[in-house]
């Protein structure tokens, strides 16, 4: 059994609680792998390769936007405009099981992502943003700009996304109505046919007329009188 203070012990405890390394999570398949070997095997599986072939540039762009937006919102809501370690913010962000993972974005590491935010002017970074090295001495301090989440470009992008969602919802509603209409027509048409074919009480009545159409009444025979007088 591993020691209480060993890394192996806490790794097993994290696995029991369902806390796995985010680097071994497949965002496309939404599957968490246990270690590097499992993640590598998953990347070679037919189901994963099939889904990867269906990913478009718009999907990758959406992952980048969602990851960046979620990170910045958490930074602003919990820490305001004070300086904070980026690693602490990231650890808080990944506690949400439904978050977009970094390995699904264009960012290779948290350091590279923080430099990207600094160059974009969305956060203040206490480091050289033009440096390309991944090793940073000390904490990776960042501070958000007050206007970083309410820029006009992002507001316009959100409006366009809402309009697109409304168009998609209207199209889906139209399809559902047409499908329901077709199903209703299929139900009523067989019922009408069965009612017509099942009514066997009606029969044809043939009427035939002879002669000129007049009805001749038979004359009543009158017995002869005893006195010999005849009446016509």
UniProtKB/Swiss-Prot annotation:
GO terms for molecular function: DNA binding; zinc ion binding. The keyword Nucleus applies. Present with 4590 molecules/cell in log phase SD medium. Residues 180-199, 211-232 are annotated as: Disordered. Transmembrane segments: none annotated. It is found in: Nucleus. It comes from Saccharomyces cerevisiae (strain ATCC 204508 / S288c) (Baker's yeast). GO terms for cellular component: cytoplasm; nucleus. Keywords: DNA-binding, Metal-binding, Nucleus, Zinc, Zinc-finger. This is Zinc finger protein RTS2. Disulfide bonds: none annotated. Signal peptide: none annotated. A zinc finger (C2H2-type) spans 24-48. InterPro entries: C2H2-Znf_KIN17 (IPR056767), DNA/RNA-bd_Kin17_WH-like_dom (IPR019447), KIN17-like (IPR037321), KIN17_WH-like_sf (IPR038254), Matrin/U1-like-C_Znf_C2H2 (IPR003604), Znf_C2H2_sf (IPR036236), Znf_C2H2_type (IPR013087). Pfam families: C2H2-zf_KIN17, WH_KIN17.
């Amino acid at each position: 059994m591993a020691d209480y203070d060993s890394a192996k012990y806490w790794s097993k405890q994290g696995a029991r609680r369902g806390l796995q390394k985010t680097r071994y999570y497949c965002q496309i398949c939404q599957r968490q792998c246990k270690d590097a070997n499992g993640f590598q095997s998953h990347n070679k599986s037919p189901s994963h390769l099939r889904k990867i072939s269906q990913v478009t540039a718009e999907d990758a762009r959406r992952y980048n936007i969602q990851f960046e937006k979620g990170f910045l919102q958490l930074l602003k809501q919990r820490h305001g405009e004070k300086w904070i370690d980026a690693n602490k913010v990231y650890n808080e962000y990944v506690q949400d099981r439904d978050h977009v993972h970094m390995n699904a974005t264009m960012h290779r590491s948290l350091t590279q992502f923080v430099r990207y935010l600094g160059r974009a002017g969305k956060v203040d970074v206490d480091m050289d943003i033009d440096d390309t090295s991944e090793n940073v001495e000390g904490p990776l301090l960042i501070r958000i700009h007050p206007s970083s989440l309410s820029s006009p470009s992002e507001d316009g992008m959100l409006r366009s996304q809402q309009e697109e969602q409304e168009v998609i919802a209207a199209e889906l509603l139209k399809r559902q109505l047409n499908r329901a209409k077709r199903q209703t027509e299929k139900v009523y048409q067989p019922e009408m046919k069965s009612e017509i074919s099942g009514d066997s009480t009606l029969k044809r009545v043939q009427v035939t007329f002879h002669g000129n159409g007049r009805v001749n009444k038979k004359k009543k025979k009158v017995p002869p009188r005893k006195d010999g007088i005849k009446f016509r």
